[in-house]
Structures are given as structure tokens and as C-alpha cells.
UniProtKB/Swiss-Prot annotation:
Endoplasmic reticulum cargo receptor that mediates the export of lipoproteins by recruiting cargos into COPII vesicles to facilitate their secretion. Acts as a cargo receptor for lipoproteins bearing both APOB and APOA1, thereby regulating lipoprotein delivery and the maintenance of lipid homeostasis. A motif (Di-lysine motif) lies at residues 266-269. The keyword Mitochondrion does not apply. PANTHER family: SURFEIT LOCUS PROTEIN, SURFEIT LOCUS PROTEIN 4. GO terms for cellular component: endoplasmic reticulum membrane; endoplasmic reticulum-Golgi intermediate compartment membrane; Golgi membrane. GO terms for biological process: endoplasmic reticulum to Golgi vesicle-mediated transport; Golgi organization; lipid homeostasis; lipoprotein transport; regulation of lipid transport. The chain crosses the membrane at residues 64-84, 92-112, 179-199, 203-223, 242-262. The lineage of its organism: Eukaryota, Metazoa, Chordata, Craniata, Vertebrata. GO terms for molecular function: cargo receptor activity. This is Surfeit locus protein 4. InterPro entries: Surf1/Surf4 (IPR045214), Surf4 (IPR002995).
Length: 269
């Protein structure tokens, strides 16, 4: 009984947090989610020559095609971010960013690096949640029109987004055999499974947001490394990728798990 009371109290705290932040949370979630694209687009501008030379050397595609690749990445990412933040053509912006993820996965040989591939897929999961949000906004414009219930594509987008966010967590698992690492893995795994199946979703996602935030600031503090060191760019990449997944989890908190979830099924029972 005491454990149930504790869980109920935690859910009350989460609900109170949502009531206070409901006007700002979706905006913060979108900003966090697109942060990795924003940072990468800006980096393309400041490292134009280095990025072009890398693509030209790796793929032997010539100066012109390498320049087109960098330009496409720059315009595609920054343009997509502007559209998402301004709430214009969000679905087209999401599809464009999906294309950028696919393009970079091939161009930078991420396909063969399981850790980076999983992070890119998790990023895609965040975009799926953003697509689901844009669909719900579109429906709200026709609130007075009778409908057949919540659209199935939106429900499955939310499910797919939640499941793909699990992949990001899996890259953070530590396989050190000490008490803290084992405890961290067990608690984190339990929370991410709850998010994936949609049980106690908002509380689990909010707890994961706080946990990832602490890990991100502690382990990926790129600002403490001089900019000329390779580790600076590596940590910066990790920092913004994790921030994007935090944005995806915040969208889960703001929107709920959707129709394909245990939380929704419980209401029917």
C-alpha cells in the first residue's frame, strides 16, 4: 500500500508539473528536438571547407557534388528547423529532416556503426512524435466536425516514436560491474520499457528526461574541452543528439502516449 501511495504521489507531482508548464512544454520540446539539426546546420556553415573536402575525399565524387552535399545539409537542416519552430509546413519539414538523417547515415558510413545508427534511429523517433503532434494540431482545426475517433496513423506514429527512443537509451548502458552502473542500468531500462509500452508514460518519460539531462551535462560537457581538440566535436555531437531525444521524451510528456498504449487501454477496462 505504501508503494502505491508513493507512486500516486509521484504521478500527482508530474500532473502538477504538466499543469504549470503545459503552455511552454511543447515549444521547449520542439526546440530540444531540433537542436541537433540546428547545431549541425550551423557547423556546416563554419566548417564548409572541411566538410566538403571530407565528402570529396571519402566518396571521390568531385568538388561540385561535395559542395552540393554540404549546401543541401545546410539549407535542409536550418530551413527545416525554421519551419518547425514557426509551425509552418511542419510535416514537410519533418520529411525533409528524415531525408537528411538518411543522407548522412550513408555519407558518413553511420550504417556500419551500430551505436551511431541507433542514435540516428532514435532521432527519427523524435521526428515521428513531432509528425504526430502536427497531425493532432491539424485535427483541432476541425474540432466541430464528426470523426471516426483518433486517426490510426497518428497512434502508430506515437508508438513508433516511443519505441525508437528506446534505442538512444540502449547506447547509454554501461557494462561495468559495479553497483552504481548496475543500478543505473536496471532503473533506466525499467523506465524506458514503461515509455515504450505506454504504461505510467508521462511519469516515466519525465523521470527519464531528468536522468538524461544530468547524464548529458555531466558526461558531454563539450564546453570544458578546447575547441581545437577532436574530443570537443565528439562531445558536442553527443550532447545535441541526447538533447534531441530529451525533446522527444518531452513531447511524450506533453502529448501523452497515444491510443496504442497500456495507459489508454486501462481506460477501456
Amino acid at each position: 500500500m505504501g508503494q502505491e501511495d508513493l507512486m500516486n504521489r509521484a504521478e500527482d507531482v508530474a500532473d502538477q508539473f504538466l499543469r504549470v508548464t503545459k503552455q511552454y512544454l511543447p515549444h521547449l520540446a520542439r526546440l530540444c528536438l531540433i537542436s541537433t539539426f540546428l547545431e549541425d546546420g550551423i557547423r556546416m556553415w563554419f566548417q564548409w571547407n572541411e566538410q566538403r573536402d571530407y565528402i570529396e575525399a571519402t566518396w571521390s565524387c568531385g568538388y561540385f557534388l561535395a559542395t552540393c552535399f554540404v549546401l543541401l545539409n545546410l539549407i535542409g537542416q536550418l530551413g527545416g528547423c525554421v519551419l518547425i519552430l514557426s509551425r509552418n509546413f511542419v510535416q514537410y519539414a519533418c520529411f525533409g529532416l528524415f531525408g537528411i538523417i538518411a543522407l548522412q547515415t550513408v555519407a558518413y558510413s553511420i550504417l556500419w556503426d551500430l551505436k551511431f545508427l541507433m542514435r540516428n534511429l532514435a532521432l527519427g523517433g523524435g521526428l515521428l512524435l513531432l509528425l504526430a503532434e502536427s497531425r493532432s494540431e491539424g485535427k483541432s482545426m476541425f474540432a466541430g466536425v464528426p470523426s471516426m475517433g483518433e486517426s490510426s496513423p497518428k497512434q502508430y506514429m506515437q508508438l513508433g516514436g516511443r519505441v525508437l527512443l528506446v534505442l538512444m537509451f540502449m547506447t547509454l548502458l554501461h557494462f561495468d560491474f559495479n553497483f552504481f552502473s548496475i543500478l543505473q542500468n536496471l532503473v533506466g531500462t525499467a523506465l524506458i520499457i514503461l515509455v515504450a509500452i505506454g504504461f505510467k508514460t508521462k511519469l516515466a518519460a519525465l523521470t527519464l528526461v531528468l536522468w538524461l539531462l544530468v547524464i548529458n551535462v555531466y558526461f558531454n560537457a563539450f564546453w570544458t574541452i578546447p575547441a581545437y581538440k577532436p574530443m570537443h566535436d565528439f562531445l558536442k555531437y553527443d550532447f545535441f543528439q541526447t538533447t534531441s531525444v530529451i525533446g522527444g521524451l518531452l513531447l511524450v510528456v506533453a502529448l501523452g502516449p497515444g491510443g496504442v498504449s497500456m495507459d489508454e487501454k486501462k481506460k477501456e477496462w
